[in-house]
Amino acid sequence: MPRLSAWFVRAALVYFVLGFTFGGLLLANKGVPLHPLTWRLLPAHIEFLLLGWTVQLAFGVAFWILPRWNTKRGDMRPAWGTLPLLNAGVWLVVLAGWLNWPAWSMVMGRVLEAAAVAAFAWHAWPRVKPWVEA
């Protein structure tokens, strides 16, 4: 497994554990109210599982799978840039929600996440080839 894929998968597993833990706390809070502020974990739970775990795992596996047939990976900088962009975006969105930061900070987090997706697409696009070229 390439080093970048390993970093993506490890980070995805950390987000999975965090998201699962927050989800468990939210579920337990429904049965036995723990604290009124427990519900403030819901946006972080969603962010960690949807973007932190799912997208990051998909990026890690996609980077590992592509390219096919022993071709070169091309310029690695956009792919390596995806990792900090996505993680910074996830944490900025989560912290903006928890700490009641201004709305622009949450928008900035989403922009970082979108930039991460664009960087990964920029890297992966030339590596996706049809099975049989005409």
For each of these PLM feature ranges, what is it?
Residues 1-134:
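Hydrophobic alpha-helical transmembrane segments of multi-pass integral membrane proteins
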